[in-house]
Amino acid sequence: MKRISYASAKVRKTLLFGEGKLIEDYENLLTGRRYTSCGGNVVIGSTKFGSRKKLPFSDMEVFSADESGYTLRDDGFGITVRVDCDEAECGALREKLTVTAEEDVFVHSVCLGGMIIADSSFTWQAPLGKRVFVPSKIARFGQPVYVGDVFIGAETPVAENGIVKGTARSVYHTARKFSELAEDGDAYSPPAFIVGAAKESGFDAVSDAFLRYVSEMALSDSFRVQFNSWYDNMLDIDPEKIEKSFTAVGDGMKKAGFRPLDCYVVDDGWTEYDKPLFWEFNSKFADGFVKESRLTEKLGGKFGVWFGPRGGYTSQTPVYAGLLEKIGYHSNRYSRDICTADPKYVSDLTDRMAEFCEKFNVDYFKIDGFAICSCPSAGHGHPSALCNVKGFYVYLWEQWLKGFEKIRRVCPGVCLNVTSYAHCSPWFLKWADFIWMNNASDMGYVGEGDSLSRCLNYRDSRYRALFLDDERQFPAGNLYNHEPCYAKRNFDPKFSKSSPVVYTDGQFELYMYCCMMRGSGLAELYFSPEMMNDAKWNIAARVLEWAESRHGILKYSRFFGSDPAKGGAYGYLAVGDNGDRVTMLRNSSGEVSEYELTMPDGKKTSGTLAPFETVITETVGGQTREIIRAKS
């Protein structure tokens, strides 16, 4: 039999082929451990042989092989698969497939990997949780799989990476004819397959290796500070109110000694929802965003805009979807909103966003609201969810990723924040900068204590659910969490449904530090300037300066401990590449907490916390200091 190998810095793939056989294995070059693979497959349909036929790569003939890859061929069904190997980020091995077909067969799916797990004492795949904003199976899309001391997955947020019948593989649910998949008419290239390596086996070691791969792969590793209009006035905005709030925030932060904000964002409230017009300005913004763009430039920042693909979140949403049907777009009859998988709609909307970059100095989009549920219709240009729900979501996100690429061609430095009804796949970060946590409300209050305590309980409880219960593998630095929020439209329903939550200066300082401990690189300020005083502006500036200077540490922040919604001690630990660390410990109950907790790095911490007490400490450059100790 013939042998040929392809290697990256950390992984080597070896093929043995001949006499009608193909054997594949992967080797972790850091440890020398090897993993046998049964290979991938293509599942096709044709009138010749019925509805479905699996074509395993291991049954195909190795037609040719060279230093960059190899070609497989199945003469019986006219399918050829070219596999090219190169090095991905962080020394991982990347396999790129190119598929050709002699007939216009229906391609149900493409499966990559097929790593046999029998010889591994450790395996992990993301658990299936309850539906929150997307179906649980879809929420698990785009998560990696860990086997022994390697990780696998496809370079897309919508591959179904998992373990089935003793093999770890990545399935891409194409659910279309070959002619629909092959953009150039001749060949189809599904997302590439990734195999990466860790220094040892086990969840912590492989997760750390995977997230370091993600940090190299991701577009953004920056710390942004920007203002968003939503919680100040919500839909009730006009140019005068925007000018007033933008100016007040810019002046307040400047007076406090903070650098110019990166961006000022107009949220929902500018769109004409009452007429059959495609994302046009309403009468309040007759001149578009010319004035706002000039103002943000004067303030030293860029301009940001909210777009809600599904048509917003009001009673007018189904009405607007119906109005757009009159001009050639489609609506989702299940969710009674715009069909966000309609390829014409996605193309035109991302064209509109690219136009905003050119006309209004936009460098940030909050893209808010995709598919609440799948669309069953067959005439919208996407696979019908009645036939293939997974294929629907694959197609939807293919269209949006193409749209994101188009926007970046116009504005390479644009920041894309992908929010509601997306899912927390780290592979989104090849196209977007931030992803909404998608298991929480914009703001929430739960558990014991005053409004500050209940606010911290809510968000931190959702972090625990995301990272400990659902075990999502996603970098904290790229997670959008809708805070800090200190604004007149923010209410704690336990105490008042009409009066905003108000903090003392001391409470505000604690709140800001706790927000920063979560590690997000997007500090989008939902402030109402009239609720701020000089002390609060100074606090905001000081805490944001600290967070920006510590972003290289805080972006690795990880939750540990009890569920804050139920009371008890918990915290966050962030450890930078050089060992610098920041730790937060908090008691979310009204009783003294004698705690003993295991932190994410395996170290134990114990002590006593007073009711609702929070302590944040840092060790940087060998010096340890207490940042804040306070009670909420």
Each model region followed by its residue ranges:
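Active-site-proximal substrate-binding groove within the catalytic cores of carbohydrate-active enzymes
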Residues: 26, 184-191, 396-616
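Polysaccharide-binding surfaces and accessory modules of carbohydrate-active proteins
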Residues: 4-6, 11, 25-168, 604-615
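Active-site-adjacent "subsite" loops/lids of carbohydrate-active enzymes
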Residues: 223-224, 231-240, 302-360
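Beta-strand-rich recognition/accessory modules
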Residues: 7, 102-113, 140-224, 500-505
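The substrate-binding groove and active-site-proximal loops of carbohydrate-active enzymes
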Residues: 226-243, 271-287, 331-350, 383-397, ...
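Aromatic- and acidic-residue-enriched segments that line the glycan-binding/catalytic groove
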Residues: 242-244, 276-285, 311-332, 378-383, ...
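Glycine-rich, aromatic-flanked loop segments that form ligand/cofactor-binding clefts
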Residues: 206, 210, 260-266, 287-334, ...
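An acidic-aromatic substrate-binding cleft motif
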Residues: 203-263, 267-272
